[in-house]
A protein has these predicted regions:
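ATP/Mg2+-dependent ligation/transfer catalytic cores
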Residues: 1-158
Length: 158
């Protein structure tokens, strides 16, 4: 979606907030929810985000094992989230809310090279340079139980 279409959504009263973010090392979408006006005013420069998203686990416990990029010694510096407008889309289950995936940059204008989106993009480029077209699919695994959360917990199931 281009910025004029986003402005149109705002003008029509169909967009109040935008969820901006990027996947962390576990693939969890991390970011923030901003007012649509703030999104428009700031999307070109990007949005500050703490680099701790590369320094914690899926439960948000800060890792202390000598991480080079994100750590206490560096003070968990800010990185910049720059929205990829090609990923901008309304969130169907939330009224007047859209989402936009961001690419991550350092404050010095360099790619955050450990960002999963950057790593994937680099691998796609390398594969294409070798004459391959990468393809991927998701496999969802789930189980059905004749139980509920309480009965499962009582039986000490996972």
């Amino acid at each position: 979606m281009d910025i004029s279409a986003i402005k149109q959504l705002m003008g029509d009263g169909k967009l109040e907030y935008v969820k901006i973010g990027a996947p962390d090392m576990e693939g969890v979408y991390r970011g923030k929810r901003v007012a649509s006006r703030f999104f428009l005013d700031s999307f070109a420069d990007g949005f500050a985000q703490c680099d701790v998203l590369f320094g914690w686990d899926i439960a948000e416990n800060v890792l202390t094992d000598h991480l080079k990029f994100s750590n206490w010694e560096r003070g968990f510096a800010d990185i910049v989230m720059k929205p990829d407008l090609a990923t901008f889309a309304p969130v169907p289950w939330e009224e007047n809310v859209a989402s936009c995936i961001c690419d991550l940059w350092t404050e010095h204008g360099e790619h955050v090279t450990i960002s999963p989106r950057y790593v994937l993009g680099t691998l796609v480029e390398r594969a294409r340079a070798l004459g391959f077209e990468p393809m991927a699919a998701a496999e969802l695994e789930f189980r059905f139980f004749r139980e509920n959360q309480v009965s499962l917990r009582d039986k000490d199931f996972g």
